[in-house]
Regions:
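C-terminal segments of enzyme domains that contribute to small-molecule binding surfaces
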Residues: 113-136, 166-194
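Extended, non-globular alpha-helical segments
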Residues: 48, 52, 95, 101, ...
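Left-handed beta-helix
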Residues: 60, 65-66, 71-72, 77-86, ...
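Conserved short-loop catalytic and cofactor-binding motifs
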Residues: 20, 24, 58, 82, ...
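Short gly/ser/thr-rich secondary-structure transition/capping motifs
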Residues: 54-64, 108-113
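Terminal amphipathic alpha-helical/low-complexity segments used for targeting or macromolecular assembly
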Residues: 1-60, 176-194
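Conserved catalytic-core motifs of eukaryotic protein kinase domains, centered on the activation segment
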Residues: 106-107, 139, 174-175
Length: 194
């Protein structure tokens, strides 16, 4: 838990303390509840898992399916409106902003044939997904990729790719270093040195 909270302090310039993260950050609560719900889902206690997941959704405004696989240090910043689908896989140190959907693209017309099929995206380590982005289908967003705000991504994203637009297009290569809100250290020091 300590490493998880520290990883958020490292990525969010507004975060002031670990206690404030625990008490006031909905993303922290959603990840905590997901760990419990996922435990029950893995143990085949699906109803208990779904009840915990629904409680978390009502408390946080963040919907994470209990069977989604989430790595270490997922940071959901602001969080309201985030949806993470059942077959989503999220790597370590991923950052997701508000109103993001990791969803499927197939309508649920023939649910029986879709139950054991990968329908949702996989995000590898150190991916950042901007607010309002829709990452849809059984695609892979590779390590260190950045998805811009409101982008609609329906195809695989290369490592260090920068995806923007509708439909999303790769417009460059991302730095491997995480910079909150894209602010460099020089810009931060210039703006706040008074």
């Amino acid at each position: 838990m300590n490493n998880f909270l520290q990883s958020i302090l490292d990525r969010d310039p507004a975060a002031k303390s670990k206690l404030s993260l625990i008490l006031t950050y909905p993303g922290v609560k959603a990840v905590f509840f997901h760990r419990i719900a996922n435990f029950f889902a893995t143990a085949k206690f699906d109803l208990i898992a779904r009840i915990i997941s629904q409680f978390s959704r009502f408390m946080t405004g963040i919907e994470i399916h209990p069977k989604a696989k989430i790595g270490k240090n997922l940071f959901i910043d602001h969080g309201m409106g985030v949806v993470i689908g059942e077959t989503s896989i999220i790597g370590d140190n991923v950052t997701i902003y508000h109103n993001v959907t990791l969803g499927g693209i197939s309508p649920s017309i023939d649910s029986d044939n879709q139950r054991e099929v990968k329908r949702h995206p996989s995000l590898q380590d150190h991916v950042v997904v901007g607010s309002g982005a829709q990452v849809l289908g059984p695609i892979t967003v590779r390590k260190n990729a950045k998805i811009g705000a409101n982008a609609v991504v329906t195809k695989d994203v290369p490592e260090n790719g920068v995806m923007v637009g509708i439909p999303a297009k790769n417009v460059g290569t991302a730095s491997e270093e995480f910079k909150p809100y894209g602010i460099s250290d020089e810009e931060k020091n210039e703006e706040f040195s008074e």
